[in-house]
Amino acid sequence: MKYFFIIASFVLCEISLQAQLFQDAGAISTSMAGLNTNNNNVWSVNNNIGQLSKLEYTTISISSFQPFLIKDFSTSNIVVGMPVNEGAFGFNYSNSGNKHLQMHNLGIGYSKKMGSNFHSGMKINYSIINAGDFYNKRSVWNADLGMSAALSKELELGVIIKNATLSKIADYNNERLTTNFQIGASYHFSKDLIVQTGLEKNINYPASFLAAINYKPNEKIIINGGIASNPSLAAFGISLIQKKFTLSFATQIHQYLGWSPDISIIYQFK
């Protein structure tokens, strides 16, 4: 029965082909219900490219995400971020699927510090979709945009646009990749406690309200949690910091489809 609901949801929502190309990446993102506008780490390569220019060291990370505990939906990611002068370059590769539907995504992005309080960036993605006899093999280019602005020491705003190019998959029925917008604000109550809120809008679906919290009880542990309204889900996770390594565990709980675990390992070349 669980498999039936999962398959039906993917078909009815038309996300089996579109959404995974824009899957939020990294366990930190997963633990905050996909609220990514004001998170700054190496996973900004995939999430908010505008935040990548805040990266202090060359960093590499890998992750494995399994939606609804279904092996065939598993997504593996690798990202690299390299600071340069007043900006940073980022690279990513991800793959997901099984023998019937495979997706590969390769991306390169650049983020730059535009003054003391504003950061912006752009990322170019090349995606390959192999869906066997139905779609055959297709490839498509698209671009993501991201930016953030510090309004004060405590308050920050961020914006993400995924597939700003409205890239087309096929001429038939004007089939295009979906475009996603996210705008959010974060407030630093202290150096150890950050609360975030935001709105996410896919051009094909109703808007979703997002909220998340980031708490650092000590120098080696970070605890995250988040909620989203559409679809209705809750998320939580924990990160363990050990010198140059950060190990993150997270999961999301969908109202109907269940658990989606994620694990990430980050290494900084300090």
Protein language model features and the residues they cover:
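Bacterial Sec-dependent N-terminal signal peptides
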Residues: 1-20
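Subset of outer-membrane beta-barrel
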Residues: 20-270
